[in-house]
Amino acid sequence: MRRILHVLLVFSALPAAAGAQTLPQRIAALGSGTVHLTFAARPGVCGDGLHSIRVVEGNEEWQEDCEPQQVRVALQVHDRRVTEVRSYVGGRWRPGVSATDLGTVRPQDAAAYFISLAERGGDISGDPLLPATLADSSTIWPALLRLARTPAVPLATRRTAVFWLGQAAGAAAARSLDSIAGDSAGDREVRKQAVFALSQRSGNEGVPALLRVARSNPDPELRKTALFWLGQSEDPRALALFEEILR
């Protein structure tokens, strides 16, 4: 009886042990091959499963159709390292495809994993930050800011982080872009990307920061870039600056 009880206890502990594995451990355990995982998309994220991923917007009286959808990510793994990331929104996995399906994972876990994947760098095909930006219930702009400011991170990844930071909602994201653009010790290309991202903020939200760059940044190339994007904004504050300069 004691032996039977012991065996039952051992087997009852197995699922808990398997469940204790982190998402990176589950992916690395494959060794080599294709991994599929699925997680909830944040509100407003839509897609057709392949050709289109978009974030819909509306106004006070109209809202574009966008049913809650899931993000599906295929990872190509070789010798326990991810070599390719393919992201989809909507659709479904084709049956019969040779892949290890991890099923549905927590969006917060997925976002953290893809941020760490981007931070690792290396020769990865695809954009690991894209699925992180799509994940539901995840605030990733602090991680994007950290990536953008870390010299050890590959330049291409840092520029991509700034791009996605520019797409993030909220005043905190705009302030982060402002701080990157004004960081005289930062990489010029990353700072120029921050200036561009500021110009893309909705409602001319980035105009005050662009005005500061154009007026007082010590780098003439950044001032020139800020002036260019201010010229595209058609904002009265930008026109006032041009009048001030030309006077």
Name each region found by the language model:
Residues H6-P15:
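Bacterial N-terminal signal peptides
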Residues P107-A118, S137-R149, G170-G182, G203-R215, ...:
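Amphipathic alpha-helical scaffolding segments comprising HEAT/armadillo-like alpha-solenoid repeats
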Residues T22-L117:
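N-terminal accessory interaction module
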Residues M1-I4:
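Positively charged n-region of N-terminal signal peptides that target proteins for export
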Residues A132-D136, L165, A169, L198, ...:
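Alpha-solenoid repeat junctions
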